[in-house]
Amino acid sequence: MRKTKIICTIGPASEHEDVLTRMIKAGMDVARLNFSHGSHEEHQGKIDLIKKVRQKLHMPIAIMLDTKGPEYRIKTFENGKIELKDGDTFTLTTDDIVGNQERVSVNYENLIKDLKVGDRVLVANGIIILQVRELKGNDAICDVIAGGTLSDRKSMNFPNKVMKHAYLSKQDKDDLLFGIKNEVDYVAASFVSTKQDVADLRSFLDENGGEDIEIIAKIENRSGVDHVEEICEIANGIMTVSYTHLRAHET
């Protein structure tokens, strides 16, 4: 029996019956659906297709719902994007402005309260690395540690912080109810920071008919690493995310 399982993300290239059939025959064990993108209608089509093919092949392919998780994003720029260079100064602000070469708005109103000087902010999946130099009013004035192209509505991650928010957003709750209705097998919980995050998710699933759904906690920040042992006490498994391109910038 093969103990290592293969998880495959189902996207535009694979959401076809012939492609999915070949993937299952090649060894796919779990079909992952990324709820950071797509509507419930689109995901319903994928789930129906997975169930159809696994029944046809008599293969017990599991379905994993990967949550969007707590979402922190920058807003928009005047021209849609900018170029940042190493050593530049760039400001994140909670003021509602249209971004430019010097600053951009964020969607998290408590950003300034939660940050401190020296904290790092990873933007656009870690391609852009900022380090907080000064906190002033509604602004976090940052040094650009790793530059690159930065465009509208890119994600932000805070690897060394536990941000003060409720773990389950309204969208996550809606997605989880959708997953319970469709009898998914696993929930991959994004940006788990503490054991309590998993406990909150477990309670929500249990209270809404999802007692049989197993939780895979995704470790994506420093707090998750620091609390991984206690997270493992309550989660059914963990998944780690590795930003290998960040290694050259570690201190």
Which residues are covered by each model-predicted region?
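Glycine-enriched alpha-helix->loop->beta-strand junction motifs that scaffold or abut catalytic
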Residues: 27-30, 183-185, 206, 233-238
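Active-site-adjacent beta->alpha loops and helix N-cap segments on the catalytic face
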Residues: 17, 38-50, 192-207, 226
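Conserved small/polar residues in nucleotide/adenosyl-binding loops
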Residues: 244-251
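Beta-strand/loop-dominated core regions that host nucleotide or nucleotide-derived cofactor-binding catalytic loops
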Residues: 74-176
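Conserved, mostly hydrophobic/aromatic
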Residues: 9, 34, 66, 118, ...
